[in-house]
Amino acid sequence: MRYKSLVKRCRLCLILVLLGGAFAWWWWQGRLERSQDGPIRAAARRYGVDPALIKAVVWRESHFHPRVRGRAEEIGLMQLQEEAAREWAAAEHLLGFEHEHCFDPGTNTLAGAWYLRKLLHRYAQTDNPLPYALADYNAGRSNVLKWKQGAATTNSVAFVEQIGFPGTREYVRTVMRRYAHYRPLFPPDSPTGQRREGERPR
């Protein structure tokens, strides 16, 4: 009887430890996901891009870790390449800008939001610019132009199916799912209901 009682107690302790670990992990993940909301909101206001979209890209690119460096020298929260970062700096007339400045969350999200807005404008004549912009962000404009043929020229559903890189296709779908997940956390700022860049009707 004592042995069975001891086993039950051990099992209960193990369950409590596992539950405690799961709660700690959930709490830490939630805190991490909220850790960059300040810079994300500021960049969204500055460039009129939906903060939920910025956050979805940050989640996919760096999982909210600002010191990440990619294999192609992309850096920071939104994994910005030097060319895109310098393009933003030139547009904003920033003197003495260096790519390394994009390790700063505020700088990175500003540059990334500016670049996302540019890509969304680039595909404004499609039925939904977002998949095109995300594919461009991940694989570059030259590849998007290869895939943007026939019905996929303006039909975003056809375009996603026509993406030639499985990794890019999954990137687009993953970010769009995460974007939908984050949208309830960022209600529209304007009482008029005017949509921001990247935002679709709810």
Predicted regions and their residues:
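Catalytic glycan-binding domains that act on GlcNAc-containing polysaccharides
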Residues: 23-202
